[in-house]
Amino acid sequence: MDAAPAISRPETRSSWLFGCAAIAAAALLVGVTVAFHGPMTFRPLGVRVQMGDAMRPLAIAAVADVALFAFAFRRCAWRRVASVLAVAIVAVSVLAAARRAAPAYPVSDRALIELATINALDGRQLYGPYSRYGWQHPGPMLFYLLAPFYAAAGSRTAGLAAGALAINLAALAAAIWVLIRHAGPALTVTFTALFALYFARVPGLVVSSWNAHATIVASAALVVISAAVAAGQIRLLPLFLAVASFVLQTHVATFPLVAVTAALVVAAIGRRWIGASAEERAGLKAQANRAAWVLAALWLLPLVEELSRPAGNMSAMWQFARQPPRGGTLPQAFDAWASALTGVFHAGLSLPQGRLIVRSMAAWPRVVAVLHLLLLAAVVVWAARHRRHVHAWMAAQSLAGSVAALWAVTRIPDGIHDHEVFWISAVGVVGAASIAAAVVGSVVSERRPLVRSRGPLVAGLSATLLLIGVPLEGLRQITVTGGPSRSKAADDHVMRVTGAIQSEIERQGSRRPMVVIDQRVWDWAAGVILQLRRQGVRVVIDDGLVAMFAGTLAPDGSEDLEISFCGGPCHERLISRPGNIVVLLTDHIAIDARPLHR
């Protein structure tokens, strides 16, 4: 009797690859269906199986995808399939968690962020986030990036957390990809290790959609990508401009970082142009043309807003920037800058909440910050001598960005707040990674056979662990809290005020209610206006505040009900006016109404 033909190892491995991919794809499809359409019932082989939790099939998909990665380690095509599946599994898992998160009732800036995101879904958002100085940040990129996740999450606040996680993961992945491809194992490992420490210190960062938080990881990616472009990777120029546009449009405090990185990139490209051949110049022109189109597309809406009115938002920002410096003293600015730059090693590191910074008496952050700059300068020289061009430019960009940040802090008026300098901590982490990689490189030569063979493996493993750990932590944050911070007492208060106002609007039969806000309670008013907008009620507000409260209407004389939010003596004045109605009176806020008969 003839023996059965032996199955070769390549055929066996291919069977395992196809099997893992099929299981991952099928489980992912089930997870998507359950997440977006509700529970499902299957009858495989006549057995009734009900699936009501999307996380179970997604967990199966994740396990199968990990197995696919393991079997496809040396096969590029299958690694790409596994990577695509991994991105899809993470995205669906995060959205599934956001869709089942408890309803949230944000106030203050977070309510304004959600209002602007709703406005972006309607295609009407032209402004960036609101600034306490009376203008808006330069552009609305943040809101248009958050909008798809918000919609996919069923218009829940947790969808903003999902969008923030996606933005941070994309920025982090871009930075790590650039480092692996162009910078070498040492810089990749130190970068991932320090950012793992950074995220562990401020875990809520990865899911926060507040603009002061949403630009942190992107700022670090900006430094890394700009270094690669300056070192000769011109094809990354469109990516650099996209990240720079996002960072600047979302938080104008990062202007010094964007300006110096762009200046060094332009200088490097100019130097390359001078010695380039005709063929190389043609390539540079092609990349510059692509970059120009990217820049034009990303800045179209801010330009439309600026040119569509006599005094646009950019004009207001320019007038503010031209004012004489009203910042604090140089010692105060230096202390705030030093604490931010060394923040990853600082015991008091926490997510900023808009609090005024109290000057620290500790001397070590100042000493370490100055030493940090000196070491970065030394790393630039060392890396250039060893022809580690990306490393040299990364240290140079970190050094220039840190110095520019100090200048910027000296110009902050009306006291230095934590959210205005927090972005500097990301630049500090990138600089620390540059220094640490130089130390490792000077001790362990990359020419050693063991380092050359195992270094990329260690770098890939560290990157993989970070890119797995960040979404897992983000998923935990969304699952447990629905976002970076929640307060049940605040939620209950917003619900109570919203319910009272909505009842009064219905009782009066109002079709165009107008809201008047006492500055002392604008944060609560923002939360209530958001809840009304969710329920389809768009209120009229003072013309000067329409940009701040996105989606509200400007007065036109047809308003039929005035609703006042009071947090102080204004309530005592209002109750004496004819026709006043006390809608609600609490320890925090007073709501008065008055019919308008025109």
Put a short name on every predicted segment.
Residues L112-Y144, P148, R326-G328:
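Extracytosolic helix-loop segments that constitute the early lumenal/periplasmic catalytic or substrate-binding loops
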Residues R48, G52-P57, T215-A218, H251, ...:
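Hydrophobic/aromatic-rich transmembrane helices and adjacent perimembrane loops
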Residues V223-I225, L237-V265, V294-A297:
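Membrane-interface alpha helices of multi-pass inner-membrane proteins
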Residues C76-R80, I180-L187, Q233, R272-N289, ...:
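Membrane-interface helix-loop-helix junctions at transmembrane boundaries of multi-pass membrane enzymes
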Residues A116-N119, W273, Q287-L374:
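Transmembrane-lumen/periplasm boundary regions of multi-pass, lipid-linked membrane glycan transferases
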Residues A162-G184, T190, A221, A378-V381:
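Transmembrane-helix motifs of polytopic, lipid-linked glycan transferases
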Residues P140, Y144, A152-A170, L205-A212, ...:
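Loop-to-helix entry region of an early transmembrane alpha helix in multi-pass inner-membrane enzymes
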Residues R9-R13, L222-L239, V247, R272-A276:
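Membrane-interface transmembrane helices that cradle and orient dolichyl/undecaprenyl
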